[in-house]
Amino acid sequence: MRLLKWLEDVLWPRGLGCICCDDLCRGRLLCDTCQKALDAMKLPYDDAAKDIRSIYRYEGVARQLVILLKDHCAADAATVLAKAMADAINAMKLPEDTVLTWVTMPDIRRKKRGIDHGRTLCEAVSSLTGMPVRQLLVRSKNGHTQRGLNREARLKNIADSIRCEGSIDSTVVLIDDVLTTGATVSVCAEALRKAGATKVIAVTATKVVLSKR
């Protein structure tokens, strides 16, 4: 078994394979095929939703990257998603004192996973924008998971559970991985505004887009 493992490491060293499909892509995180598939998931800019910017449809490679980030805390997945998010933020020409924060995870889930994937994504965006990260949001209670809930149920689930710790008097960019109904983002944005944020802009890596029938 050790010999087989040695041969595998020699012939297929770690770090040379695509993080989504394992195809060889020396020096890059995504192979050409997965990168093209990810680019095809990009959402057009919606001028009517200036306070919420979602980069990719929550499908295909984009969805796979979010799952890697959320369920496996994969920093490489955060790096890939953060690139387009940072490009979008830099294009906004925000004030110099703008700070980044993230949608906080319930303590019980954070302790179970050992890491907060939202913070990982936020810090990856920070490294590309130069904007500082502040932990502003905290959960006052541990709600149930939001997965599978509609907007009304999500709002009820997190009602009064998110608050802003301390005060803030600048523009805040709220980072999240998936926008589903917008309920969680709305509650977080309201908490930030109550704490004094002059403007809150949510930037999410992906968005669930319902198919039109």
Residue ranges of predicted features:
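Glycine-rich phosphate/pyrophosphate-handling loop used in enzymes and phosphotransfer proteins
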Residues: 1-176, 180-213
